[in-house]
Amino acid sequence: MLDFLAGNGEENITRFEAEIVKNVCKDTYILFLNKKNSVILNHIKRNSNAGLTEGEIAQGIVAPQDFCNRASALTLGNENLQGTGIFNLSMDEYNALNLSSEEKELVKPFYTSTELYRYYGNANNKLWVIYTTSKFKNKSEMKAYPNLKAHLDKFIQVITSDNKPYGLHRARDEKFFRGEKIVSLRKTAEPYFTYTDFDCYVSQSYNVIKTERFNLKFLTAILNSNVIKFWLRYKGKMQGDNFQVDKEPLLELPLIVPTELEQAHLSVLVDQMITAQEQLNSAISDSDKKFLQQRVDILDKQINTVVYGLYGLTADEVKIVERG
């Protein structure tokens, strides 16, 4: 500290000049940026012409009792119940319930990082979620679903949902889980965004982006680009070296909407990336994995090159962005 105050050891010290305006900085993070990074971030912001809105982003399902934990198993007096599905079900548990066609309509395909990758989402789910909205706080609503009712009744003592005994704690607007959308893991070592066009229900570990104002494949490319990663690192929220891609940072992203031709070009590259990621995910031999990883890396470079151009970054700025 004394060396710092005396101006010694400058080679190990980074100094920042800051102008803090109280009314602007109130209730926000104060970020320390070196001059080069600040110039690039301002350049990115100036070239942005779009952004996401509140109504286009939703957090995933909140279900405190997804599976039975040890404490709940002890409360229920049966340690063997630990790991058993409550609102979430494994494939075996789903099949064992012998659900009627009406009951199956209430159980939705549930996805985790096991199926959701950068760009590519595998539609073959391994888990299910009993998707009961707040209306199931009324116990009579469950009468039409006897097998599901019997299942949840076994855990009624430990269900703490605001909509107990049968409703999820926070089910969310179902439109976000249906059809074309982008799914984003909230806490991650590397930000990644998954394009899905199938019904895809996720937990609160994810945010879901659904909008008709963007070509969603194009938007997936922008969100997975080095430009947005750079922005999130220095203008978003970080927990140590991990990115915390919450709703607020997503709302502040400096997005861009170019011509339809430019959007179409990136969309084609995204289609190729999704195919390559799918093939990589199912590859068995080391040689196939190596070849497909090289293909993914090439496509990544092509996508980033296009995005750098859209934001008007210079060659020197690109070098800084790629160093992170």
Question: Where does each model-flagged region fall?
Answer:
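Short intrinsically disordered, low-complexity coil segments enriched in acidic
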Residues: 1-8, 129, 136-137, 265
